[in-house]
A protein has these predicted regions:
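An N-terminal boundary/leader segment
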Residues: 1-53, 289-291, 364
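Short, conserved phosphate/pyrophosphate- and ester-handling motifs at nucleotide-, phospho-/glycolipid
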Residues: 18, 79, 219
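Short alpha-helical scaffolding segments that buttress acidic/His motifs in well-ordered protein cores
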Residues: 25-29, 308-309, 355-363
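Conserved hydrophobic/aromatic pocket- or pore-lining residues that grip, position, or stack substrates
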Residues: 29, 51, 79, 111, ...
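Structural helix-boundary/capping segments
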Residues: 31, 35, 39, 164-271, ...
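Short helix-loop capping/hinge segments that flank enzyme active sites or metal/cofactor-binding pockets
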Residues: 71-91, 250, 255-262, 315-386, ...
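Short glycine/serine-rich loop/turn segments
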Residues: 71-213, 264-266, 315, 401-419
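Short, surface-exposed loop/helix-turn segments at secondary-structure junctions
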Residues: 94, 98, 141, 239-244, ...
């Protein structure tokens, strides 16, 4: 049996049936990591001994009948901005190079309760600020589909680890597309749930009103299964929702008859690579052939999404990142003659250029004299974007479009031009601003063999509709 080719759900079934064990699966994936990390660099930290010990404990519980769930024994990777008790959590930043949390994020605990084995922490853009996983203090991650290209970001390490078979599934976080865009670039499935569905407790904050944890997986079945596992109401997160409809795997039905799918004309204009456009529209035709009603419509305000997002996200980041000052934990500059100099040097030396850029922008838009002109205006536009989506979902069940305007860029091409990097999020950020769920599903490759993702967007709390549409497409093209 080729263990590594199995999906997470298939692996758990094989373990339950005694065809393999959690220890064998963990050892196989650790061997793959050892062989591939020099090329791909998906991980910041690999907890080899800890993972094998955890796998042994899980295997005993499976054999005793104490763990029977659909993810028991499955090795997972965790993005390095989620706290993991006793394991280095760096946010891919120098400022947290020595930070070992004393608790785990709620989403990670939910996985562990289900019997998942935690392999380690994946590389990311520093503090999740970036779209290429090139702003990491610990080096760039490469795209397993073509190592000369980026894996996307900021959850690039998680997406690349799934694509390279260096884990069976992974957790990422999505503030403006950070799960969906790398999923598209690496040819895996990635989902951002409705805001408040998965607890943010233990997620190191970037933009608190936008951040959401979600799965990166090999297929839609795994995606629904992981989402069902990590979803829970958590009183430790004030934005956590109490949801009744969290049996997401019940939506794994290949049936879109009568489903109304809207295609925004605004998403298919100038700047979209023709190969991406053709692949996404071909995917829409597949759903149409399965009985969905597909039509074009106008979704205005997309042009305002980028300035609105970068105003709000930078403002929240400048506030959230104030806590990293060299006093209680993290990097501390040496030889400072007074407290103020120590703060200044710790932050100057600890943060990378992209993080500094966003802290400066955020501080500017929140400063007196500019607060109304920029920040409050951005909040008003955010409300208008939500209203535009509400109007669209009064008519359509699902909105279908591209995830990114191009396939994965070459390494180094985006860092030279930050604006180009920001524009790469044009199709994903409005979903975060509106708090909606979105999923990226592989829908082909370009002429270079680089993956293309189709994005399906749903109304708040309509993950099941998205899963049904994504599953139908996936089964239709198998």
């Amino acid at each position: 049996m080729d263990i590594l080719s199995l999906t997470a759900v298939e692996l758990a079934k094989a373990i339950r049936e005694g065809k393999t064990t959690a220890v064998e699966a963990t050892q196989a994936v650790l061997d793959r990591i050892a062989a591939g990390e020099d090329t791909y660099h998906c991980y910041v930290t690999v907890e080899r001994e800890k993972a094998l010990k955890q796998a042994e404990e899980v295997q005993k519980k499976i054999e005793a009948g104490e763990l029977t769930g659909p993810l028991a024994g499955v090795p997972f990777a965790i993005k390095d901005n989620m706290c993991t008790e006793g394991t280095l959590t760096t946010c891919s930043s120098k400022i947290l190079e020595n930070f070992i949390p004393t608790f785990s994020a709620e989403a990670v605990l939910n996985l562990e309760k289900a019997g998942a084995v935690i392999l380690g922490k994946t590389n990311m853009d520093e503090f999740a600020m970036g779209s290429t996983t090139e702003t990491s203090y610990y080096g760039v991650t490469r795209n397993p589909r073509n190592p000369e290209h980026v894996p996307g970001g900021s959850s690039g390490g998680s997406a690349a680890a799934v694509a390279a078979e260096e884990c069976f599934a992974a957790l990422g976080s999505d503030t403006g597309g950070s799960i969906r865009q790398p999923a598209s670039y690496c040819g895996v499935v990635g989902m951002k749930p409705t805001y408040g569905t998965v607890s943010r407790y233990g997620l190191i904050a970037y933009g608190s009103s936008l951040d959401q944890i979600g799965p990166l997986t090999k297929d839609v079945t795994d995606c629904a299964t992981v989402l069902e596992t990590i979803t829970s109401h958590d009183p430790k997160d004030s934005t956590s929702m109490k949801r009744e409809d969290t049996d997401f795997t019940s939506a794994l039905v290949a049936d879109v008859k009568g489903m109304k799918i809207g295609i925004p004309r605004d998403y298919f204009g100038e700047g979209l690579d023709p190969e991406v456009r053709d692949a996404v529209l071909a995917a829409a035709e597949v759903l149409k052939a399965q009985g969905a009603e597909v039509e074009e419509f106008d979704l205005s305000l997309v042009d305002y999404a980028i300035p609105t997002y970068y105003t709000i996200a930078a403002a929240e980041a400048s506030s959230n990142l104030e806590r990293f000052d060299g006093v209680k934990y993290g990097y501390r500059a040496q030889d400072a003659e007074d407290l103020h100099t120590m703060y200044k040097r710790s932050r100057s030396q600890g943060f990378g250029p992209e993080v500094k850029r966003r802290i400066m922008l955020g501080s500017f838009v929140l400063s007196s004299g500019y607060y109304d002109a920029y920040y409050l205006k951005a909040l008003r536009v955010k409300a208008l974007i939500k209203k535009a989506f509400d109007e669209a979902f009064a008519k359509y069940d699902v909105i279908l479009g591209p995830v990114a305007p191009t396939t994965a860029p070459k390494l180094g091409s985006s860092l030279a031009d930050p604006i180009k990097m920001y524009l790469g999020d044009i199709y994903t950020i409005s979903i975060n601003l509106a708090g909606l769920p979105g999923i990226s599903v592989p829908c082909g490759t370009d002429s270079q063999g680089l993956p293309i993702g189709m994005q399906l967007i749903g109304d708040c709390f309509k993950e099941k509709t998205l899963i049904r549409a994504a599953y139908t497409y996936e089964q239709s093209v198998k």
